[in-house]
Regions:
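Cofactor-pocket helix-loop regions in the catalytic cores of large enzyme subunits
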Residues: 1-181, 185-188, 200-318
Length: 318
C-alpha cells in the first residue's frame, strides 16, 4: 500500500475495485466509512451488490472479465476532457503517448456492451476520480487472483499516475493482501521464484550470494513449482511429498477433484496447523502449530510497516 490506512479517513475520494473490505478487512472498512463521514465520495466497482457498495455514491456493476475495457475507457475520458495532471505526467511518468494511443479507441460508447456499464456512468466515474483533490484506490483478491490481474493493476495505477494521485497525502494505490503476514512471508522469500527481498532464483549472482549466506556449495537454478501446478506435477512423479503450513488446499484450491487425487497419490503429506483442517485430516503426519498468541513475532502489515506481537499464552506447539 502506498497509503497508511488512516490516511483513507481524509481522502476526497475512495475508489474500491474488486474488493469488499466490509467482509474481508473490517478495520479498512471502518476507515472507508470515516472517509464517507468526512465528505469523501465513494465509488465501488464490483459485479455484485457487495456490502461496501451500500455506502457508495456510485456502484459500477461491470460484467465479469471487463476490467480493462472499463479502466481504459475511464483513462480515455480523463485525457479527452483534459482532466489529467499535465505537470505530474511530464515530470514523474514515462510512456504517456503510448498509453494515450492504447486508450484512444476505448470510448465509453464502444465498451458499453462489453462492460454492461452505460457511457454516462463511465464518464461520471472518470470525472469524479480525476477531479477529486486526492483519491485513493483500493483493490483486493478480486483483482489479483483473476486472470487479468497484472493488466488490471497496471490499468489502475495508470489512472493514479494520470491524475497525479501518488506521492501526496491521502492519495495512492493500495493492494490489500489476503492473509495475516502474507506481506512478510513474501518479503522473506516464501515464493517459488524468489529469495528474500524478491531476488530472483534464476539470477546466478543471487544464487551464489544465498548459497554463501546459507553455507551450502550451490543452489538449484530452476524455480519452484506453483501451488496450481501440484496436480500435474504429482501425476508425472515430479512431486512425491508435501509439507503444508497454515494452508488448507483441500478446502480452498481450485479444481478440488484434481487436488484430492494429487493428495491421494502423494507418498507423504505433512501438515502443520493450529486447526484440524480438511487437509490435515488427509495427512500422514500432523504437527500441532503454535498460534500467534503463543510466540513473540515480527509481522509486516499491509502498509509494509513492521509490528511486534508479544507472547500471551504458554507455548503448546511447534
Amino acid at each position: 500500500m502506498s497509503n497508511a490506512i488512516n490516511e483513507i479517513d481524509n481522502t476526497d475520494l475512495v475508489f474500491v475495485f474488486g474488493y469488499n473490505p466490509a467482509d474481508s478487512h473490517p478495520i479498512v472498512a471502518n476507515h472507508v466509512i470515516n472517509a464517507k463521514r468526512n465528505g469523501a465520495k465513494i465509488i465501488v466497482c464490483d459485479p455484485r451488490k457487495i456490502e461496501t457498495a451500500r455506502i457508495a455514491d456510485m456502484h459500477i456493476a461491470l460484467k465479469n472479465g471487463s476490467n480493462i475495457a472499463l479502466l481504459n475507457a475511464m483513462g480515455h475520458v480523463i485525457i479527452e476532457e483534459n482532466l489529467y495532471d499535465k505537470a505530474f505526467v511530464a515530470s514523474r511518468t514515462e510512456g504517456f503517448e503510448e498509453y494515450r494511443k492504447i486508450v484512444e479507441g476505448y470510448t465509453p460508447e464502444s465498451v458499453e456492451d462489453i462492460t454492461g456499464v452505460s457511457a454516462s456512468e463511465i464518464r461520471q466515474a472518470a470525472r469524479m476520480y480525476a477531479q477529486a483533490e486526492s483519491a485513493a484506490i483500493l483493490w483486493g483478491m478480486g483483482v489479483t487472483q483473476f486472470y487479468q490481474g497484472v493488466e488490471t493493476v497496471r490499468s489502475l495505477t495508470s489512472l493514479a499516475m494520470l491524475t497525479g494521485n501518488l506521492g501526496k497525502p491521502h492519495a495512492g494505490v493500495n493492494p490489500v493482501r489476503g492473509q495475516n503476514n502474507v506481506q512478510g512471508a513474501c518479503d522473506m522469500g516464501a515464493l517459488p521464484d524468489t529469495y528474500p527481498g524478491y531476488q530472483y532464483v534464476k539470477d546466478p549472482a543471487n544464487r551464489e550470494k544465498f548459497a554463501k549466506a546459507w553455507g551450502v556449495e550451490s543452489l538449484p537454478a530452476h524455480t519452484g513449482y506453483r501451488i496450481s501446478e501440484l496436480p500435474h506435477r504429482v501425476a508425472h512423479g515430479e512431486v512425491r511429498a508435501a509439507y503444508i503450513m497454515g494452508e488448507d488446499p483441500l478446502q480452498t484450491d481450485a479444481e478440488l477433484s484434481a487436488v484430492r487425487k494429487a493428495f491421494e497419490d502423494l507418498e507423504l503429506v505433512i501438515v502443520q496447523d493450529i486447526f484440524m483442517t480438511k487437509t490435515a485430516s488427509a495427512a500422514d503426519v500432523i504437527l500441532p502449530s503454535t498460534s500467534w498468541a503463543s510466540m513473540k513475532a515480527c509481522l509486516l502489515r499491509l502498509t509494509v510497516a513492521s509490528s511486534v506481537s508479544s507472547r500471551r499464552l504458554s507455548r503448546s506447539g511447534i
